[in-house]
Amino acid sequence: MPSCTTPTYGVSTQLESQSSESPSRSSVMTPTSLDGDNSPRKRFPIIDNVPADRWPSTRRDGWSSVRAPPPARLTLSTNNRHIMSPISSAYSQTPNSLLSPAMFNPKSRSIFSPTLPATPMSYGKSSMDKSLFSPTATEPIEVEATVEYLADLVKEKKHLTLFPHMFSNVERLLDDEIGRVRVALFQTEFPRVELPEPAGDMISITEKIYVPKNEYPDYNFVGRILGPRGMTAKQLEQDTGCKIMVRGKGSMRDKSKESAHRGKANWEHLEDDLHVLVQCEDTENRVHIKLQAALEQVKKLLIPAPEGTDELKRKQLMELAIINGTYRPMKSPNPARVMTAVPLLSPTPLRSSGPVLMSPTPGSGLPSTTFGGSILSPTLTASNLLGSNVFDYSLLSPSMFDSFSSLQLASDLTFPKYPTTTSFVNSFPGLFTSASSFANQTNTNVSPSGASPSASSVNNTSF
């Protein structure tokens, strides 16, 4: 009969099963003194074997190929290891980027490094393929170009002027975005011409086009050609490759400065009539083509468009309003909200020839059970109404307005939409009075039975 005794697995059993040629694992892992070394320090014995970088590394499906760094207490500094050495000793071949202190210091964070993966401790297969900040991982976000968006950008740029030379990168990004949105919204499509290959010497030619100021004395040709802040003229110069300048009488906005410069050197053009000067510099086979294209576009701008059909003027005015910060987007009114005129409560009692007499008893005109009998007599003076604590904030509940709307004051009367709570309270002050104030006011306002109401108990109050 086999014995049911559990075999003992002790140290003696393991030592007997080992051969004499191979040392035991306990003897390899136990620090021993070296021969001829009197130093009390202990170290592992060095046994030459296959280098650790040639060991086949096991790869698990779904795990990253970069091994996790070992704990500091298990890392060995020697390069020669025994085959029975701890597994953690093979981690000395880990790249330096994974063992750097900045990698595991929570106070320092690396945004992007070519040798450092963006997700070093992730366990996905594609963690080493691309970085979170690589061009393949992120795509540029295009915002829809609208007039409201451009107005917000210009407003933010004006706010940045309060902090000069502090947000240079933000200002540069804002300028680029403003230019992109402006081109998408207000860029005038000037046709481009096909030019031959440059050949010959560089020459410069100039042409002058007079503005029909006498035929259209009230038309603003200068503003139409230049545009807001000179944007239209700059765009025309960029598309045609020619320089566009407005010269002559009336070309300067400041008339006093124009009269002061008239007759001086380099200001001879002020003696001439208002005109547009087009200048082009290029090779002989290209300069005339570019100049002719620029002259055609300027002549089109000098033809006034009928009122209300000038699309270029509309864009220029809208762009100017955005630059000046005076642009207001057109919003359609909300038809669901109707503004009703509500009379406000007068702070002083109104004087009238005859008093308004109403029943002083509570609940005679309106049912008192709706608001707990807190309806006041309309004969209450305005001074007492404003001076006492007549507003009960406990009544401001969602069911209050529903209860009030349920009161059928008239068959064809609908509950109006009050714009504010104050207008509602001022319209119906009797509904916002506590029971204590109602009792005090009842004692002072109600006259004894059989006696005529006195002048002190009846006041003229308009609701």
Swiss-Prot record:
Record keywords, A-Z: Developmental protein, Differentiation, Meiosis, Oogenesis, Phosphoprotein, RNA-binding, Translation regulation
UniProt xrefs under SUPFAM superfamilies: Eukaryotic type KH-domain (KH-domain type I)
Effect of R314K: 1.2-fold decrease in RNA binding affinity. 11-fold decrease in RNA binding affinity. 1.3-fold decrease in RNA binding affinity
Ranges of compositional bias, category Polar residues: 1-10
Keyword RNA-binding part of the UniProt annotation: yes
Effect caused by changing L320S: 26-fold decrease in RNA binding affinity
Keyword Cytoplasm on entry: no
Residue ranges annotated for the KH domain, each copy included: 208-260
One GO process term, biological-process aspect: positive regulation of oocyte development
Recorded consequence of changing Y149F: Moderate decrease in monomer stability
Chain positions covered by the region annotation Qua2 domain: 305-336
Effect of K313R: 11-fold decrease in RNA binding affinity
Result of changing P228S: In rrr1; 89-fold decrease in RNA binding affinity. Small abnormal stacked oocytes and feminization of germline. Overexpression of oma-2 and to a lesser extent of egg-1 in germline
Region (Qua1 domain): 135-205
Site (Involved in RNA binding): N220, K243, R247, K313, Q316
One of the record's GO molecular function terms: mRNA 3'-UTR binding
Modification(s) after translation: Phosphorylated by cdk-2 which may negatively regulate its expression in distal mitotic germline cells.
Free-text note on domains in this protein's UniProt record: The KH domain and the Qua2 region are involved in RNA binding.
Subunit structure: Homodimer.
Role according to the record: RNA-binding protein which recognizes the 5'-UACUCAU-3' RNA consensus sequence. Binds sequences in both the 5'coding and the 3'-UTR region of rme-2 mRNA. Binds sequences in the 3'-UTR region of cye-1 mRNA. Binds to cyb-2.1, cyb-2.2 and cyb-3 mRNA. Binds sequences in the 3'-UTR region of tra-2 mRNA. Binds to the 3' UTR of Notch receptor homolog glp-1, thereby repressing glp-1 translation in the embryo. Binding to the glp-1 3' UTR is inhibited by pos-1 binding to an overlapping binding site in the glp-1 3' UTR. Germ line-specific tumor suppressor essential for oogenesis.
Protein name as catalogued: Female germline-specific tumor suppressor gld-1
Organism per entry: Caenorhabditis elegans
